[in-house]
Regions:
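N-terminal, Lys/Arg-enriched amphipathic/low-complexity engagement segments
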Residues: 1-58
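Short, structured beta-strand/loop micro-motifs enriched in basic residues and often containing a Trp
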Residues: 8-18, 59-67, 158-166
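A generic structural signal for residues embedded in beta-strands
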Residues: 35, 80-83, 183
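Short, Lys/Arg- and Gly-enriched loop/turn segments at beta-strand edges
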Residues: 40-51, 88-98, 189-199, 292-295
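Intrinsically disordered, low-complexity linker/loop segments enriched in Gly/Pro
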Residues: 87-177
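Conserved mixed alpha/beta catalytic, RNA-binding, or beta-rich assembly cores of soluble enzyme
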Residues: 140-169, 173-250
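A hydrophobic, small-residue-rich beta->alpha segment in the mid-to-C-terminal subdomain
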Residues: 227-282
Length: 311
């Protein structure tokens, strides 16, 4: 198998999804790709102080600065792209901003009329620690916020909302190194985009941003025809994961749970009229529901079945 490397340049980055964008790299199933991505908004130079304006890859900017698209030979609608995340190494700096928008949440929290907070982080990937300009330190757990394919429909599509069709801005903190994300293929060649590095993030991404940072990611890309679960799903060091995306958090929860119940019926070899109800009963004892993010208008919930939770 071949190893490829992809750097972020004006020719290899985009800020919208489109099936019409020509691939910047074509690979075979099983190939390894080392992808370097800028931070979410595409800073070309690091900030020296919180909130400092620096040149961006795209001005004006329409969405996340993503590296790609990557064509995978043999990936066609009806197949699934397996993205195996071998390693993720954040850059040496990152930023976080909160209460920057006047929306229902900032109004509910009494923050809409006050000043926002902007933090600048020094990131030590070797030690796995980030320290911000206020002196707070957090453990790093790097992952990519955006791993996605363009929608099947033509035209340009925002990178902001995660989609059941193609994934994208999933923002799931579970997708660390050692995980495999399974994306049903939406367009010929898959046209994978990667970016939006997060050095650390809590469930919910409650402030609207994580520790946003450049990232170097090593992936192995493969094409499978018989996925273990419906829709977008993952196997991570923590367990099996299914996702739901919807502006209504209740609907997002139901989507994630429904996909997990289908997966559990197969895992537990359940059959009969009560198979799904039995899966729900077992999930109630051994599974988890977590709010992925409330930052992207289309909210996310993921269901988690931890490894070894069921004997």
């Amino acid at each position: 198998m071949t190893e490829h490397r992809l750097e972020p340049t004006p020719e290899t980055t985009v800020d919208v999804f489109s099936r019409d964008t020509a691939p910047v790299l074509a690979v075979e199933p099983g190939d390894t790709v080392v992808v370097r991505s800028l931070d979410a908004i595409g800073h070309l130079e690091r900030q020296q102080k919180p909130g400092e304006v620096q040149p961006l890859m795209f001005e004006p900017r329409r969405g996340h600065c993503l590296t790609g698209p990557i064509e995978v030979h043999g990936a066609e609608p009806g197949t699934v792209l397996a993205v195996r995340l071998l390693s993720m190494r954040p850059g040496d700096w990152g930023w976080t901003a909160a209460a920057t928008k006047d929306n229902w949440l900032t109004r509910r929290l009494g923050l809409a009329d006050g000043p926002p907070s902007r933090l600048l982080w020094e990131l030590d990937a070797e030690r796995g620690v980030g320290i911000n300009d206020r002196g707070h330190s957090v453990a790093l757990a790097p992952f990519l916020g955006v791993i996605g394919l363009p929608p099947a429909a033509g035209g340009e599509h925002s990178t902001n909302p995660p989609r059941a069709e193609g994934g994208g801005n999933i923002d799931c903190r579970e997708l660390v190194a050692g995980s495999t994300l399974y994306l049903p293929v939406t367009v010929p060649g898959a046209l994978l985009h990667l970016g939006d590095g997060h050095a650390a993030q809590g469930d919910g991404e409650v402030g609207g941003t994580a520790i946003e940072c450049p990232m170097t990611t090593e992936v192995v890309l493969d094409v499978i025809t018989e996925p273990a679960a419906p829709g977008i799903h993952a196997v991570t060091p923590a367990g099996r994961i299914t996702f739901g995306f919807h502006p209504d958090l209740n609907e997002a929860m139901a989507e994630a749970l429904d996909a997990m119940l289908v997966w559990m019926q197969a895992l537990l070899a359940l059959d009969g009229d009560d198979a799904k109800a039995t899966a729900l009963a077992v999930a109630s004892a051994a599974g988890d529901l977590r709010i992925t993010q409330v930052a992207n208008d289309t909210w996310g919930v993921h269901a988690v079945l931890p490894h070894g939770a069921i004997g």
